């Protein structure tokens, strides 16, 4: 089973209908269900679920419900993290998030790419590319970050943006597709 996940992380095109994916997706969906059903007042329980779900998460973090991810183990988050409600991380490839990162509501980090050819897409052919987010980043609400994107340190991503390309450190970007507004 590890072999197919290693291949997926390496960026090769694979059969997304492979039963190994289905098992992991179902297990992760179960963990997300329990996280989302656990009240905010049960902080220790929520923390334990999150630590069991993610590959790594540092100290001082808040993940508001509802939250959703695909595998969980490909998510690596630093210290002092806030993930607001309706955060979705489609982590077929690694998602690395630095320290002091705030992500607004209704944001999606998507590592998965489906084939553009309908025949291949309908057969489940997919590829994944990692996402990297540096330290001290604020991603406002309703943002989509696409596969393979690297967001540099100190970046601010404006509300409603679709980030399709790498973002240089210490810049503000906004729009669809996201474009540099100014340096910080």
Regions of interest found by a model, annotated:
Residues 5-6, 53, 123, 130, ...:
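Short secondary-structure boundary/capping segments
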Residues 1-60, 178-181:
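Terminal amphipathic alpha-helical/low-complexity segments used for targeting or macromolecular assembly
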Residues 141-166:
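Beta-rich strand-turn-strand
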Residues 156, 172-174:
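Short-chain dehydrogenase/reductase
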Residues 162-164, 172, 180:
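Conserved hydrophobic/aromatic beta-strand scaffold that supports enzyme active sites
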Residues 40, 67-77, 82-150, 176-178, ...:
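Flexible, glycine/small-residue-enriched loop-and-beta-strand segment within the central core
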Residues 169:
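Short, conserved catalytic or interaction motifs in soluble domains
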């Amino acid at each position: 089973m590890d072999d197919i996940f290693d291949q997926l992380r390496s960026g090769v095109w694979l059969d997304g209908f492979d039963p190994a994916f289905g098992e992991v997706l179902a297990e992760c969906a179960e963990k997300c269900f329990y996280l989302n059903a656990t009240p905010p007042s049960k902080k220790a329980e929520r923390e334990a679920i999150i630590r069991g779900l993610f590959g790594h998460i540092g100290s001082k973090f808040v993940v508001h419900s509802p939250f959703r991810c695909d595998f969980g183990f490909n998510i690596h988050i630093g210290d002092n993290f806030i993930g607001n409600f309706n955060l979705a991380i489609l982590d077929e490839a690694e998602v690395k998030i630095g320290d002091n990162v705030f992500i607004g509501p209704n944001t999606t980090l998507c590592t998965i790419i489906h084939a553009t050819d309908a025949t291949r897409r309908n057969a489940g052919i997919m590829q994944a590319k990692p996402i990297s987010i540096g330290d001290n980043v604020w991603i406002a609400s309703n943002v989509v970050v696409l596969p393979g994107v690297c967001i540099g340190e100190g970046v601010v991503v404006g509300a409603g943006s679709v980030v399709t390309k790498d973002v240089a450190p210490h810049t503000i970007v906004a729009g669809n597709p996201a474009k540099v507004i100014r340096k910080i």
